[in-house]
């Protein structure tokens, strides 16, 4: 009789590393200012634009103090002068506690909701509410867990949990749900845990130092903590930070919290918002909550129409308004939705309410420094001559085009088994990928070969 041997496959364990995507502004860590709000020439990923960065630093201090609401700042300048970079630097400098919402001007035009609703939601997303609440917790080291399972296999489990601190020891009776939570979290004797009395949530803090010498197989991530002292039951203040929009969505309908994850918020009634405002004001009076005025950044603000600008005028006067930062690269142009022209495509009455910060074109030295920072961010090694050629391309075309050539040149370099990007790699990708001016030149030369051409009869000097 043949014997069959069963082979068990051992699953292969792979290290899952988190991939950080490199974006256009991922190299920016802050505004690069010192304690006196003086900008450094190159710091935290920011280069040049000293006056604009100093102005942004002053606005940043006003936001941090939280004393102002409804102030609006316009960052105006030519394309490629770092307007969005300054706004991203402000977001990084503010940190995760201050709400920062970034939208583009064209995002508010949707078939699902009105323009004013989209703007209102963006405003409410930018205002945080820090809610303080006191909860009772049980904190101690697990001495023993006894679980009595019914002999039949069916029925509810019961058990006892022994917890201790340096001063006392207590036995707690356990129900079925608590036993399931302890089993799920793999809690065992020697673990230091906290139990929230209101919700029954169990949090594992680590292993007790008294068990450090026990013979046990444990991973490098095992954390050892002191055995808690004092009483087992303690009162702890927990701080939650949520945005007004999140409170709106949760209260707008039954199971509204699910809409936070799906994104299908829809239009929210003004009555709901008024009730929430009244409740938040009440919490504020009682000292339970505080308002954190955040930042709403609207890029390409000239894309808004006259109705949206009219709404912004009114919204900025509200006491629940965040600091509004807008960016535009337009000069004197037509206001969308009208036949009138205005500076930056923004009505005069709104311009009167704005603090305007202007950005100037980067110098050759600044562009070279920015390209160096981008090469470091993208892990690309480049020779000094290649930097000079790339800077020259950036001056003649645009900084964005030069930055986009970095990755392409790096790929060409790797294909020829090189380690450092040389001038030939830059020249090759420059010949492969056209910039805006060379593309326009090509179209004008071969305009008759294209299917549609609106420059009929126009001649161009291509010399």
From Swiss-Prot:
Keyword Acetylation: yes
Gene3D superfamilies: 1.10.8.60, P-loop containing nucleotide triphosphate hydrolases, RuvB-like helicase, domain II
Gene Ontology biological process terms from the UniProt entry: box C/D snoRNP assembly; chromatin remodeling; DNA recombination; DNA repair; regulation of transcription by RNA polymerase II
Residues bearing the modification N-acetylalanine: 2
Modified residues (Phosphoserine): 437
Main location per the UniProt record: nucleus
GO molecular function: ATP binding; ATP hydrolysis activity; DNA helicase activity
Enzyme class, spelled out: hydrolase
Linked residues for Glycyl lysine isopeptide (Lys-Gly) (interchain with G-Cter in SUMO2): 9, 444, 456
EC nos: 3.6.4.12
Localization terms from the record: Nucleus matrix; Nucleus, Nucleoplasm; Cytoplasm; Membrane
Catalysed transformations (reactions): ATP + H2O = ADP + phosphate + H(+)
Keywords (A to Z) from UniProt: Acetylation, Activator, ATP-binding, Chromatin regulator, Cytoplasm, DNA damage, DNA recombination, DNA repair, Helicase, Hydrolase, Isopeptide bond, Membrane, Nucleotide-binding, Nucleus, Phosphoprotein, Transcription, Transcription regulation, Ubl conjugation
GO cellular component: a single term: Ino80 complex
Residue sites binding ATP per the record: 77-84
Family: Belongs to the RuvB family.
Binding partners and assembly: Forms homohexameric rings. Can form a dodecamer with RUVBL1 made of two stacked hexameric rings; however, even though RUVBL1 and RUVBL2 are present in equimolar ratio, the oligomeric status of each hexamer is not known. Oligomerization may regulate binding to nucleic acids and conversely, binding to nucleic acids may affect the dodecameric assembly. Interaction of the complex with DHX34 results in conformational changes of the N-terminus of the RUVBL2 subunits, resulting in loss of nucleotide binding ability and ATP hydrolysis of the complex.
Primary role: Possesses single-stranded DNA-stimulated ATPase and ATP-dependent DNA helicase (5' to 3') activity; hexamerization is thought to be critical for ATP hydrolysis and adjacent subunits in the ring-like structure contribute to the ATPase activity. Component of the NuA4 histone acetyltransferase complex which is involved in transcriptional activation of select genes principally by acetylation of nucleosomal histones H4 and H2A. This modification may both alter nucleosome-DNA interactions and promote interaction of the modified histones with other proteins which positively regulate transcription.
Protein name: RuvB-like 2
Gene it is expressed from: RUVBL2
């Amino acid at each position: 009789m043949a014997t069959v041997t069963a082979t068990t496959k051992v699953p292969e364990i792979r290290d899952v590393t988190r991939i950080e995507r490199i974006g256009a502004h991922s190299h920016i860590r802050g505004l690069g200012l010192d304690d006196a709000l003086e900008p450094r020439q190159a710091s935290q990923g920011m280069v040049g634009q000293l006056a604009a960065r100093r102005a942004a630093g002053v606005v940043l201090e006003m936001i941090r103090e939280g004393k102002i609401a409804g102030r609006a700042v316009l960052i105006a300048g030519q394309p490629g002068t770092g307007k969005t970079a300054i706004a991203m630097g402000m977001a990084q400098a503010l940190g995760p506690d201050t709400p920062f919402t970034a939208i583009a001007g064209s995002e508010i035009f949707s078939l699902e909701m009105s323009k004013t609703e989209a703007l209102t939601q963006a405003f409410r997303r930018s205002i945080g509410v820090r809610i303080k609440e006191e909860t009772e917790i049980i904190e101690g080291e697990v001495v023993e867990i006894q679980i009595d399972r019914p002999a039949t296999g069916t029925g509810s489990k019961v058990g006892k949990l022994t917890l201790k601190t340096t001063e006392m020891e207590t036995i707690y009776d356990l129900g079925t749900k608590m036993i399931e939570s302890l089993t799920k979290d793999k809690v065992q004797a020697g673990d230091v845990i906290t139990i929230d009395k209101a919700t029954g949530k169990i949090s594992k803090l680590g292993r007790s130092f008294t068990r450090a010498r026990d013979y046990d197989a444990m991973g490098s991530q095992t954390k050892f903590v002191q055995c808690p002292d004092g009483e087992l039951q303690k009162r702890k203040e927990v701080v939650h930070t949520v945005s007004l929009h999140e409170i709106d969505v949760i209260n707008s309908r039954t199971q509204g919290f699910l809409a936070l994850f799906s994104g299908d918020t829809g239009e929210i009634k003004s009555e709901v918002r008024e009730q929430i405002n009244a409740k938040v004001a009440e919490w504020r009076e009682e000292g339970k909550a505080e308002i954190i005025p955040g930042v709403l950044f609207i890029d390409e603000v000239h894309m808004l129409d006259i109705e949206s600008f009219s709404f912004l005028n009114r919204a900025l006067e509200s006491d629940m308004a965040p600091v509004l930062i807008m960016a535009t690269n337009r000069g004197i142009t037509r206001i969308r939705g009208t036949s009138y022209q205005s500076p930056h495509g923004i009505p005069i009455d709104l311009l009167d309410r704005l603090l305007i910060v202007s950005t100037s074109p980067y110098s050759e030295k600044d562009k070279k420094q920015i390209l160096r920072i981008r090469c470091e961010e993208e892990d690309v090694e480049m020779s000094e001559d290649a930097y000079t050629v790339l800077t020259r391309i950036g001056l003649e075309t645009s900084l964005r085009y030069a930055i986009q050539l970095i990755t392409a040149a790096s790929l060409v370099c790797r294909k020829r088994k090189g380690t450092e990007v040389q001038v030939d790699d830059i020249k090759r990708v420059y010949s492969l990928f056209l910039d805006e001016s060379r593309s326009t030149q090509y179209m004008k030369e071969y305009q008759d070969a294209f299917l549609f051409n609106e420059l009929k009869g126009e001649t161009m000097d291509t010399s």
